Amino acid sequence: MNYINMNILLLLCLSFISSSYISLHFDTLIGNLTSSNIKNILPYNYIYTSICVGSPSQCFNLNIELQNPLLSIIGSSYNSSSYPKYDSSKSSTYKEGEYKTFKRSEPAPLEGEIVIFNFAGYESTDTLTIADKTISNISFINVDKNFISDNLKENSGILGLDLRLSEGVSKEMMLINQLKKNNVIDDDVFYIEYKDEHKGNLIIGEYPHKVSSSFKEENAKETYAYTFLNEVFWGINFNSIKLNNSEIEYDFKVSMFSIESGFILAPNPVLTQLNKTFFKDYIEKGFCKEEAGDFESFSCEDTNNVNFESFPTLSFYHKEINMTFSFDYSDLFYKFEGRRYCLIFGNYDPFLDTYWILGKPFFIKYKTFFRPDSKRIGFYEIEPSKPFNFWWILLLVASLIIIGLLIYIVVFVLTKKRKKRAIELDDDYEYIPKLNV
């Protein structure tokens, strides 16, 4: 009986160890498998990412096609965690289910237009009255209400809203108040304005955190600068969107960045062609003036002659884990068909491991982590694609089986020897009769 119990116990221990290993590496294995599957669906000139609110069942997919000279995007509000299928034989106007197709037009002026992701059923309109003043050129992109549950407070997430107002920051404040008044956004959302002189790029999200200790209180109130305690922000901002029958023409950018002590570590990467003095523009807006020095301005056409090694490496310190991270500005650029494009890149998150995007083919896997305030936030981590090989999984399973058999054989042999020895000792035992005294 003891022999059977011992073997069962050992097998249970082995099963526990095996299952623990597989559980720890399950996301990697599945990520590799997913990457392999997606590779057959999406060519290498695609970026696939998502905005998620609360869970994988509430995501807005962005499937960005890097196609010269056009950039195309396919977005869908979907109710399952499966990847949407893409038919490469069809054009960029391909639609399936709830797919909405956006087609890029020529870049429009940076100021004077407003684009809003309409999550609350706000009626589409070309104008919006703010403080008794009508602002035109407003486009609302309607998204199914199922995309966000009725109780926004129960689902964490970050929503992107890009404002391009020629009037400046003060009018952005009016717009936010108007949107709250019309229940387009919740009263508890927060927003970030980089600098007073900077127009646009206003990020909408949830759960305002305390202002970083390095902010002066009056400065924080003046610039409305909040921090997520060094965690990753990201927003998807659309500029110059115009309704055109069933299609929407656009010029867009995607940003993913982190904030430390009020310093914007990563300028918003622009997915369209760099046709302006990118770094100089951001430095003059106060992004990196003190920390990074004065960069030489350049345009997209002459980036091939730029010595990226001359740019300093930006470092930032994470208080909670007592570590310093850094990145180089050259990581922002990806050379595609002889031209440089500035791509979305992953900053870092200590809870999700450090990751970077360096212009390689990359795909995604779903991640969930908990904020310091215990609010869950889910999103798709963008990661370099990894070749998936079925034989690695087979080898892993075979190795575990072989190890289990070896342990079983060793235990079986030792137990058998022990029983044999016990029998021999029992045979050598002589009965000594009890003497009556």
Residue ranges of each PLM-predicted region?
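Aspartic protease catalytic domain
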Residues: S20-S23, D27, I141-N146, D196, ...
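A residue-level signal for conserved active-site and pocket-lining positions in enzyme catalytic cores
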Residues: E65, L128, L159-G160, D196, ...
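Aspartyl protease catalytic domain
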Residues: S20-P43, T129-E249, F336-Y348
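Short conserved beta-strand and strand-loop elements enriched in small hydrophobics
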Residues: S50-V53, S124-K133, I192, I241-L243, ...
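Signature of the N-terminal lobe/flap region of pepsin-like aspartyl proteases
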Residues: L42-N146, E284-E296
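Extracytoplasmic, non-cytosolic globular domains
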Residues: K253-F287, E291-D294
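Short hydrophobic beta-strand that contains or immediately precedes a catalytic carboxylate
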Residues: I51-V53, F60-E65, L71-I73, I158-L159, ...
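Cleavable N-terminal signal peptides of Sec/SRP-targeted secreted and luminal proteins
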Residues: I4-S20
